[in-house]
Amino acid sequence: MRALRSTRLIALIGCGLAVVLVGCGKKDAAFEIITPPVPAVLPKHWNVPEFALTERTGGTVILADFSGKVWVADFFYTTCPGPCPMMSSRLSEVQKQLGTEPNLRLVSISIDPEKDTPDVLKLYAEKFQATDRWLFLTGPKAGIYALARDGFKLPIAEPETPGGQIIHSTRLILIDRLGAIRGFYEATNETGVNDLIRDIRKLLKEK
């Protein structure tokens, strides 16, 4: 009788253990992190519209100057106390890794052109050791705001209070050789700049 009870007890323990193991297996599967695959070909969004702005050197830059080039754009201003220095640091990292690529350009467009004159932009560019392949642009405020909102579809707004911060996007935008936007990357996220560098390399290989 005791032997029978012992056998039943062992069987029950075995079943319980089996249930626990199966349950754990299901739980692990439920919490498994699945990383979405990186697309082999980057999607094409829309084309950047025509523009004409002034570079820190005093020269005029137009959209056609980027024909045949892969370029990365951002909208910033030199007195920004918030994310702009980080955005510029991210582009500096791109320059560090890919700055020798002859068909790559970095383009920082000021959204405070009244203060960000070419001379001011020149001093700012020096802080980040920007080469001549990293352009800093300024120009008419209305045109720049329209370019940000309508051309790149990025939010931008005047300060809510006098002397306040200009509200703007912290995204970096990747544009291909034909002027088509191919991706947006969050500059405040380290993963964003890593993804950007990866995708720049993809576009540089595109014919």
What would you call each of these model-derived segments?
Residues L63-P85, R90-L91:
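Short active-site neighborhood of thiol/selenol oxidoreductases, capturing the structured segment around
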Residues K69-V70, M86-I109, E126-K127:
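Conserved helix-turn-beta segment immediately C-terminal to the redox Cys motif
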Residues K122-S169:
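Short, internal strand/loop/helix patches
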Residues E160-K207:
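Thiol-/selenol-based redox modules, centered on thioredoxin-like
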